[in-house]
Structures are given as C-alpha cells and as structure tokens.
C-alpha cells in the first residue's frame, strides 16, 4: 500500500493494485475563496474571514495528480474536500467517467447533476473490483455536526486494513470502528478546524492520542493540515504537541507530495 499526501485531505492511495484519489480538492492556491466570499454560511473566528483557501498550492501539476487514478472517494461534499463551481456543480477537474464512491444518495445526486456517470453510495459491502469499501460513521463537530460526513474502511486480503477516519472528532463510533476492524493503517484529519456554531470540527492532538492509545500498534497518519483558514493547529504546532505527549515516534505527519509505503503484513 502506498499513501501519498497531496494537500489538505486529498490523498492518492494505491491499494491492492488499484489507485484511489480521496477527497480531490484540486483548486489552485486561493481559488476556492474566503469564508466571506463563500456567503457567510459558516461563522468563524475574527481574523479568518478573509484568508483565501486553499492556503498552499498543489505539490504537483493537477494532471500529474490525476494520472493513473482508477476511482475517487469523496467522504463529503464540502469545499475543502471537492471543488465546487460557482454554478453549484462539483468535481470539475475530474474525469466524469471515473468510478466515484460517496457517503449518501444526496451526495450521489450532486455528482450525477454535475455530469458523473458512475457513482456508488458506499454501504457495508460496496466493492471496487475485489476491494471492500465500507462507509463508517463520523461526527463533524463537537457542538453540532457541520453537515454529514463519513469515514471509509478499505479491506483486501493482500493488504492491511486501511481506515480513513474522514472529518470527525473522537467519539464512541470511532472507537467502535477501531475495535471492529483493527486497522493496520489509520489516516486522521487533525488540524482542529473550528467554527463558532459547530465547535471543533475534526481531531486535535488530544483526539490523535486517543486513537493511538486505542489502536494497538497501527500506523497513524495525520492529514488535513495547513490549508484551511479555520484550522487551529498547524503542522509545526502538531509536531510540538505530539512530542509533549510522547507520540513523536508513533504518528506520521507527511509533507504535501510525500509518499508513505506500508507492507502487506503491517
């Protein structure tokens, strides 16, 4: 298994011989806009309203990122996970014939309206070739959820179980997913993004520690860093915080463009 950190929550994953692009937010630096330009739907802290997102450019040309992709996984339709055009269509940079896996019929309809032809809602037994794709729960906010989101389990007999936690905080369902699936590799979105009404939207260092303590030796990867205005933890902050918690050797935090490789017996 190879996992390449692209940017924010966008990952390029080669698993059991197939390549998935996860949460393909492929806009150039600043092209998505600011919280103010997005219409004030979300209330954020002072000082973050006018920061253009994404805050960093892609590490490679878009066409290189898309090269060799067999299917896409979109955990939820938010503007930092999939490109949303002014007319409301989504995923403009993607080949509309690519197989696409989503969390719900609502998200599937959004992709179909945008011209995609092969959209599958993930359930307990969804498959891409012989790879099992299972939607698992996520809670996208400590106060109230910032819309629906999901995690995804990838399972194949020749690979470690991979758990993409998605946009979630630590809560009982995450612990249950860890107990049920015993993943060998876990990806956590963990910049502690914060909105006034919804609270903290995804994991912070304390949540990362809870996962590490619960996962019995799995490789833990921190993603979704350094690209959204409402983040409250940067990569540099997270590195310090993990060291203070004694987790600097237990957690991997890849740079944009970096590839991580995990053996089948992980």
What is each residue range found by the language model?
Residues 18-73, 84-89, 143, 170-180:
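Pre-active-site segment of Zn-dependent metallo-hydrolases
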Residues 48, 99-102, 169-256:
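Cap/insert and terminal regions of metallo-dependent hydrolase folds
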Residues 21-23, 51-54, 68-80, 101-104, ...:
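Active-site neighborhood of phospho(di)ester-bond hydrolases with catalytic His/Asp-centered motifs
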Residues 1, 94-100, 160-162:
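Short active-site oxyanion
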Residues 102-159, 240-265:
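Metallo-beta-lactamase
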Residues 5-18, 26, 127-184, 202-203:
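Catalytic core of the metallo-beta-lactamase
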Residues 83-92, 106-107, 230-238:
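Metal-dependent catalytic neighborhoods of phosphoester/phosphodiester hydrolases
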Residues 27-29, 77-82, 107-110, 126-129, ...:
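Active-site environment of divalent metal-dependent phosphoester hydrolases
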